[in-house]
């Protein structure tokens, strides 16, 4: 089975790819993207006016989304708040990963983690392929937080 990806190729240019749906490593989650936003950083990349666009290498884009759990890696039973999860549940996830060890993380400022962006802008031709939400699927790494979305919250608000 293959999934579809829209990726950044360079200034004002996006490409399209189909890649195999990856096997999910222990502790990871694969999500079927239901709804995604276009963020200001995505627009800056498209215009070529961001640091991420400077290298102009192929990179997955999109990071504000709501999705449905498609595959669960071994050991994943709850979200980052301890709520039980199963295949089919809707979730959201911050696009950054927090190390929990740097000065910012120790101060509770996970948004300023020094190691937060190690998986942002991944090449769509490299495993796990689905590193952005402008795609049919999105890969959530074992160290990445995610949260179950209540049934009462519509996709358009959850994203």
Which stretches of residues belong to each language-model region?
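Short Gly/Pro-enriched turn/cap motifs at secondary-structure boundaries
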Residues: 9, 20-21, 56-62, 125-130, ...
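Residues that act as N-cap/strand-start positions at coil-to-secondary-structure junctions
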Residues: 13-16, 53, 132
């Amino acid at each position: 089975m293959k999934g579809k990806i829209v990726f950044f190729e360079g200034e004002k240019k996006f490409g399209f790819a189909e890649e195999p749906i990856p096997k999910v490593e222990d502790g990871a989650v694969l999500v079927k993207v239901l709804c995604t936003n276009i963020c200001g950083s995505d627009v800056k990349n498209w215009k070529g006016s961001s640091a991420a666009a400077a290298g102009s290498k192929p990179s997955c884009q999109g990071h504000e989304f709501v999705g449905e759990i498609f595959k669960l890696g071994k050991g994943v039973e709850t979200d980052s708040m301890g709520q039980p999860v199963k295949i089919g549940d809707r979730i959201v996830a911050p696009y950054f990963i927090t190390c929990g060890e740097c000065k910012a993380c120790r101060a509770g400022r996970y948004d300023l983690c020094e190691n937060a962006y190690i998986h942002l802008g991944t090449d769509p031709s490299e495993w796990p392929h689905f590193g952005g939400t402008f795609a049919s699927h999105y890969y959530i790494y074992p160290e990445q937080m995610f949260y179950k979305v209540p049934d009462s919250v519509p996709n358009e608000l959850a994203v």
